[in-house]
Swiss-Prot record:
It is found in: Plastid, Chloroplast; Plastid. Pathway: Lipid metabolism; fatty acid metabolism. GO terms for biological process: fatty acid biosynthetic process. This is Acyl-[acyl-carrier-protein] desaturase, chloroplastic. CDD domains: Acyl_ACP_Desat (cd01050).
Amino acid sequence: MALKFHPLTSQSPKLPSFRMPQLASLRSPKFVMASTLRSTSREVETLKKPFMPPREVHLQVTHSMPPQKMEIFKSLEDWAEENLLVHLKPVERCWQPQDFLPDSAFEGFHEQVRELRERAKELPDEYFVVLVGDMITEEALPTYQTMLNTLDGVRDETGASPTPWAIWTRAWTAEENRHGDLLNKYLYLSGRVDMRQVEKTIQYLIGSGMDPRTENNPYLGFIYTSFQERATFISHGNTARLAKEHGDIKLAQICGTITADEKRHETAYTKIVEKLFEIDPEGTVIAFEEMMRKKVSMPAHLMYDGRDDNLFHHFSAVAQRLGVYTAKDYADILEFLVGRWKVESLTGLSGEGQKAQDYVCALPARIRKLEERAQGRAKEGPTIPFSWIFDRQVKL
């Protein structure tokens, strides 16, 4: 799972934020935890709270799904076994990172590495900023498995639970684990990046966690993962396209192979939400509205390298400029999910459900309109150093 820029949550002042009204029908009484804050002084904060995220985390809400909804997910276990697990590949049929990298046991290893590095020389620094950002996001996989295991009704209760939900989470994690491994090894061999700074960023990110605002609620959680897997599919697809344009066909193959995995995972998560719309259209459309009013925060939004408190914003700006992941992509994903789940054709909804339906169906056009206005006002971005590429300057 990866990703990036959100047109409505970036620190850029381009677009306004939408206010979220209180939604009640899907919610049980909330348990609220104090928000996590970081001082504006990074030096002071580093001394006081060295393991805190680089920016404020939202007020934490937990276990918002009413207990009676838990039975829905229990009743779906047979369905999940037949319809979800089919989107996993047996390990023996899966690709492995070594399939795409020089073989250190092979006599021609050093020559293969030289060839890889020669190809990498043709790629611009800005491309490596985006590729490193994608890799770091993939490497924070422990956080994403943790997030899935916070969801009521579907978590792995023991660490080796035999339920289809738990099997999916573990096997999905195992498949995703290859993505960060492959990109990490490629970047190490390329010689183009400061691996110690990259590794520090990974450690900071895993230590900071993520703040998806899914409230232990699988309705919100699976809507979030549906969105994220499609965003990752788009992002890796675009890094593959750019690698090919710069003449590195093997790197394009690496990124394209990861893209295919993300597409398969997207299909699985969207099927879960599709089933929820079939069983509980009212609750699901309200959850969809809530997730979109909150605005989908990207998994790596707490990214930090020990220097740049706005690292994720800067990385996202480069991804936007290169067309790797953009505000348009965000709107396109939302429009795709509205169509995939047939939200416009839902009937029999309450007044609250109809309002939620109207909101999510109108939102893609609204986002596009806001982005068009923002582009019209946009000024040329500054050039800043990125520690990942030895502090070389890249335009935002």
